[in-house]
């Protein structure tokens, strides 16, 4: 897995485990980030700039990334609260236990589907734990209706953070870290 600066995260993780010698205290310690956002879907992460919608590509709503899903399920990316499930069920906004505001927007212009092909498993105000199933969608039906299923994952209050580190260009499973935030 590659970080934003091209460093192989798996290599770093392996090196940080230590080699059992007494010199482990010289090794760089893993950074503790203020908040972490896990992948809410299974698929490939891509930079926001690759999203075919200027609202997301130009990060008008905040910094983030997008996921090209391979499965029609959306999971909670952290412990927190569902701020809103859009009436059309194509998007969910959440607030983490640490105050990070995230919107997960399934597909582009999918508001036009008026909720068709989406099933919400949570309601506004619900408390969620990382990994809870929040939403299901019929990827093939959405594509057949003429819509892209690429899913932006946006930190709406990204200006509150000094660093927003995104992991793109990799295949992810729900629960894999994709965004790290530092104050």
Go through each PLM region and give its residues.
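Contiguous, well-folded functional domains in the mature portion of proteins
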Residues: 3, 18-183
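Intrinsic-disorder-associated, low-complexity terminal segments enriched in Asp/Asn/His/Tyr and depleted
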Residues: 8-13
